[in-house]
C-alpha cells in the first residue's frame, strides 16, 4: 500500500533502501538509465576515496555513465556524520529538482535516511578531550561497560545501539555529558521533516539463507578483487589507524586485524562474512520499523519490475 501522497506539481523524492548485498546499486542504475532520476548515495563508507573494493563501490566507468552524488567526497582520515549527510543531501536534492529531475536516494545507511526524512535536532559539537577520556575508559573496561552506562542515562538510545558500536556509544555518552540531556530527548526536539512527498521502496531478500549466500559470494568476490591489498595500502598511511570511523567499516576492520597478524586468511573470511551478516541483521531490524513504505520487493522483483513501478509513481498512477 502506498503512503506517499502525490500532489500535482510537487516534486517528489525517491528512497531505495535495503540491507547489504541486495542489489541496490544495480536497481538504482537501472532506474537512472530509464527515468529522469539522479542518484544520491546513502552510504557512510562510499563517501571515502580509496575505499573501493570493500565498499562494493560502482566502477569509475559506471560512475562516468551514471553519476552518483556523495561518493568519493572525503579522505578516509575524515569523519562524516548524519547531520553533515543531511546538509549535503538537501543541497543535492534542491539542485536536482532545479534541473527538472528527480532525486533517487539509494543505500543502506539507515541512520542517514532517518536523519534526512525526519530531521535532526541541534546537537553539540564533538569534544576531543571528552572523546579521548571515553576511549580510555573503553580501553580499560570495554565498550560493553560504556554501553551499560548509556543504558542508565538513555535507555532508548542503548536499546537501538549495539554494545559493540563504539562510535555511536561514544557519541551518545558525549551528548549526555555535554548537555545533561539524553541524545534521544534532543533528537525528538525541533526536528524538521523532509518537505517533499517520498516514494519509498525497500529491497528485502526472500529468506535469511538467500541473503547469507549473497553476502558470502560478495565477500569472496572482494577478496578475489584485491581487498586485502586495498586495506594494506591504507594501513601504510601514517594518518590512518584502526579507530577511525572509515577503518571501522564492516570488512575493513577485519582485514586490518588480519594484516596485524590476529588471525589467518580463512578466519578473516569467516569473520568478514559474520560481521557482514550482523550488519545486515541490524539493517533489517531497522527497516522492519520503517513507516510509509510504498512497496516491499525482493531483489528479483525489483530487478524485473522496479522501473515500471517507479514510473507509475512519478506519473501519479
Swiss-Prot record:
Q: Where does substrate bind?
A: 20-25
Sequence segments annotated as region (Interaction with substrate tRNA): 43-46, 167-171, 281-288
**Positions of the record's site feature: Interaction with substrate tRNA:** 109, 131
UniProt cross-references to InterPro entries, sorted A to Z: Dimethylallyltransferase, IPT, P-loop_NTPase
Question: What Enzyme Commission number(s) does the record list for this chain?
Answer: 2.5.1.75
Query: What does the entry list as the binding residues for ATP?
Result: 18-25
Which residues span the membrane? none
List GO BP terms, alphabetically: tRNA modification
Q: Which reaction does it catalyse?
A: adenosine(37) in tRNA + dimethylallyl diphosphate = N(6)-dimethylallyladenosine(37) in tRNA + diphosphate
Pfam families registered for this protein in UniProt: IPPT (PF01715)
The UniProt entry, under SUPFAM superfamilies, shows: P-loop containing nucleoside triphosphate hydrolases
- Molecular function in Gene Ontology: ATP binding; tRNA dimethylallyltransferase activity
Query: Which cofactor is recorded for it?
Result: Mg(2+)
Q: Which UniProt keywords apply?
A: ATP-binding, Magnesium, Nucleotide-binding, Transferase, tRNA processing
Q: How does it assemble?
A: Monomer.
Q: Which PANTHER family match?
A: TRNA DIMETHYLALLYLTRANSFERASE
Q: What does this protein do?
A: Catalyzes the transfer of a dimethylallyl group onto the adenine at position 37 in tRNAs that read codons beginning with uridine, leading to the formation of N6-(dimethylallyl)adenosine (i(6)A).
As for family, the record states: Belongs to the IPP transferase family.
Q: Give the protein's recorded name.
A: tRNA dimethylallyltransferase
Source organism per UniProt: Alkalilimnicola ehrlichii (strain ATCC BAA-1101 / DSM 17681 / MLHE-1)
Amino acid at each position: 500500500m502506498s503512503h506517499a501522497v502525490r500532489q500535482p506539481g510537487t516534486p517528489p523524492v525517491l528512497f531505495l533502501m535495503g540491507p547489504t548485498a541486495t542489489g541496490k546499486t544495480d536497481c538504482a542504475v537501472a532506474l537512472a538509465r530509464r527515468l529522469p532520476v539522479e542518484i544520491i548515495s546513502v552510504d557512510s563508507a562510499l563517501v571515502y576515496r580509496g575505499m573501493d573494493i570493500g565498499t562494493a563501490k560502482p566502477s569509475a566507468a559506471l560512475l562516468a555513465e551514471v553519476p552518483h552524488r556523495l561518493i568519493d567526497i572525503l579522505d578516509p582520515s575524515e569523519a562524516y556524520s548524519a547531520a553533515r549527510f543531511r546538509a549535503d543531501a538537501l543541497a543535492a536534492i534542491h539542485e536536482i529538482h532545479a534541473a527538472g529531475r528527480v532525486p533517487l536516494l539509494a543505500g543502506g545507511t539507515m541512520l542517514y535516511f532517518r536523519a534526512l526524512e525526519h530531521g535532526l535536532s541541534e546537537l553539540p559539537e564533538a569534544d576531543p578531550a571528552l572523546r579521548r577520556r571515553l576511549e580510555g575508559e573503553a580501553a580499560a573496561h570495554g565498550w560493553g561497560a560504556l554501553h551499560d552506562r548509556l543504558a542508565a542515562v538513555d535507555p532508548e538510545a542503548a536499546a537501538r545501539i549495539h554494545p559493540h558500536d563504539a562510535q555511536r556509544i561514544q557519541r551518545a555518552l558525549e551528548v549526555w555529558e555535554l548537555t545533561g540531556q539524553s541524545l534521544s530527548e534532543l533528537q525528538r526536539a525541533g526536528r524538521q521533516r523532509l518537505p517533499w512527498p517520498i516514494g519509498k521502496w525497500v529491497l528485502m531478500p526472500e529468506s535469511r539463507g538467500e541473503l547469507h549466500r549473497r553476502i558470502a559470494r560478495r565477500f569472496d568476490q572482494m577478496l578475489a578483487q584485491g581487498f586485502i591489498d586495498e586495506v594494506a595500502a591504507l594501513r601504510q598511511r601514517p594518518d590512518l589507524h584502526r579507530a577511525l570511523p572509515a577503518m571501522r567499516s564492516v570488512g575493513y576492520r577485519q582485514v586490518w586485524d588480519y594484516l596485524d597478524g590476529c588471525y589467518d586468511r580463512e578466519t578473516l573470511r569467516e569473520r568478514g562474512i559474520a560481521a557482514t551478516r550482523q550488519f545486515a541483521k541490524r539493517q533489517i531490524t531497522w527497516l522492519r520499523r520503517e513507516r510509509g513504505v510504498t512497496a516491499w520487493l525482493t531483489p528479483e522483483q525489483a530487478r524485473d519490475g522496479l522501473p515500471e513501478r517507479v514510473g507509475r509513481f512519478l506519473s501519479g498512477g
